[in-house]
């Protein structure tokens, strides 16, 4: 498994193309699907308002391994993307990169608006750009005046049905509170972990191979 390979310290780069659902089989709900999104297995209707759970924070799950380089990237920030790929290539250990990108068909976004949607994800704090290197956090793009997360939601048809529901404002407010609190937490972690990498047996001689684990 991915977690096992990271825990053993193998040097590799794992890139997640995060389009927030099982899109190649027809837009089913996944752990990565955001709150309020309309999918075939968590639809918006009389009794449901789409997916009710928060999007799984796979980036923090991977960062918890502590011996890893973890980063988020977006289509709209290509230089940030390239720098993180270069850093992952040079990192002596496992690297995990989460790339947020629209599925234009099932997000119901026009082909020429995918990059703009990515930009809004970053500007609304829905998809913060940051990296974690062995426990040291760094927010690579700070947003001084974030836009409301509603702007990001309105840019995609997958939220349209939910936004018409009587409980829409409650869902919007909950998501806004979540993304704001998460961003503030990242800034706090950046300050708290500055120049304080997690210490451990990260040298190559301590990497346990599958053969040794048998």
Label each PLM-derived region with a short phrase:
Residues 17-21, 43-48, 101, 126-132:
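Short C-terminal domain-edge/linker segments immediately following a structured domain
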Residues 81-214:
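Glycine/aspartate-rich loop-and-adjacent alpha/beta segment that forms the canonical ThDP
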